[in-house]
Amino acid sequence: MNNIRKTHPLMKIVNSSFIDLPAPSNISSWWNFGSLLGICLIMQILTGLFLAMHYTSDTMTAFSSVTHICRDVNYGWLIRYLHANGASMFFICLFLHVGRGLYYGSYMYLETWNIGVLLLFAVMATAFMGYVLPWGQMSFWGATVITNLLSAIPYIGTNLVEWIWGGFSVDKATLTRFFAFHFILPFIVAALAGVHLLFLHETGSNNPSGLNSDTDKIPFHPYYTIKDILGVLILIATLSSLVLFSPDMLGDPDNYIPANPLNTPPHIKPEWYFLFAYAILRSIPNKLGGVLALVLSIAILTIIPLLHMAKQRSMMFRPMSQCLFWILVADLLTLTWIGGQPVEHPFVIIGQLASVIYFMLILLIMPITSMIENQLLKW
């Protein structure tokens, strides 16, 4: 009798994706983040579903419905904070996952990489719209400021913004549609993640050396299932600590004040995971220029395969590129810090310098360094 795992139409797909999948024998813990992102997505969809059962997407009741969830619903506070801090864990895993791809040259799998960039945009859109739903001060003003950026688009800008708002300001119509989009987008993300995985399994995983590993493969289960469980345990421990000890650490206290269109908060800033892009937006004094820089700060990932000049795929054997990679990481951390600071000296100039360095590193310095390293190999 044939093994049902290998013959059943559905089990066959699961088997070839998670059980008998041939994986390189030397992939490190940096390869754990794909599975962690899957866990995060499932957790966000489940907690979000239970929150949606009690949430009302109306400007009059949205804030009090969130309060009701935290005070009156059984373990509502737990579900709410798991969802809010789960988003932070999601983005930590996302950034580390993208960083791994940049360091080890995984972007050479073009389809997988480009769908990954699309996924990043989709998750960012989902998180932004989710932040609007509690209808606190930062929700309202964040939505106003960010949607208003679209008015910088020539000719159609103003009409576009009013179309998205469903009126002449952020109001009931905006909140309702944001809730609808926030509910549907995670399922689109899940579908895209399936396609991401499909394209990855066409080529197989990359590995730290960047060399072809076809001659040395091991089955995914039990080796990498066990290895992934360690990552999952660390994720759960970190998230639990955050939720149970300091659930509001990553949030903004202004969001505990109900939305008031007549009162602007002193410092409007998004959640921490958008601060690097927000800093790039603010560092350009022109509105349209800022919006373009904001979009390009993420969209630039799509052209990274074109900028790959090195003879080796991975940075493992390229010490000069390694240094530049860590400078890029430090630069992004600097931008994240600046995004949370008020617009005043010296933060403005630091943000502008960090923004210029960010684009210079990716577009110019790293490709040139790769070419220099190619020459050094001719000794």
Swiss-Prot record:
Membrane topology note: Multi-pass membrane protein
Residues engaged in binding heme b b566? H97, H196
Per the entry, which co-factors are needed? heme b
Its main subcellular localisation, reduced to a broad class, is mitochondrion
Pfam families linked: Cytochrom_B_C, Cytochrome_B
| GO BP field | mitochondrial electron transport, ubiquinol to cytochrome c
Looking up Gene3D superfamilies in the UniProt record yields: Cytochrome Bc1 Complex, Chain C
Q: Source organism's superkingdom?
A: Eukaryota
Transmembrane feature ranges: 33-53, 77-98, 113-133, 178-198, 226-246, 288-308, 320-340, 347-367
GO cellular component, as recorded: mitochondrial inner membrane; respiratory chain complex III
Q: Where located?
A: Mitochondrion inner membrane
Q: How is the cofactor bound?
A: Binds 2 heme b groups non-covalently.
Q: Supply any other comment.
A: Heme 1 (or BL or b562) is low-potential and absorbs at about 562 nm, and heme 2 (or BH or b566) is high-potential and absorbs at about 566 nm.
- So what does this one do? Component of the ubiquinol-cytochrome c reductase complex (complex III or cytochrome b-c1 complex) that is part of the mitochondrial respiratory chain. The b-c1 complex mediates electron transfer from ubiquinol to cytochrome c. Contributes to the generation of a proton gradient across the mitochondrial membrane that is then used for ATP synthesis.
Q: Which PANTHER family match?
A: CYTOCHROME B
Subunit structure, interactors included: The cytochrome bc1 complex contains 11 subunits: 3 respiratory subunits (MT-CYB, CYC1 and UQCRFS1), 2 core proteins (UQCRC1 and UQCRC2) and 6 low-molecular weight proteins (UQCRH/QCR6, UQCRB/QCR7, UQCRQ/QCR8, UQCR10/QCR9, UQCR11/QCR10 and a cleavage product of UQCRFS1). This cytochrome bc1 complex then forms a dimer.
Name by which UniProt lists this protein = Cytochrome b
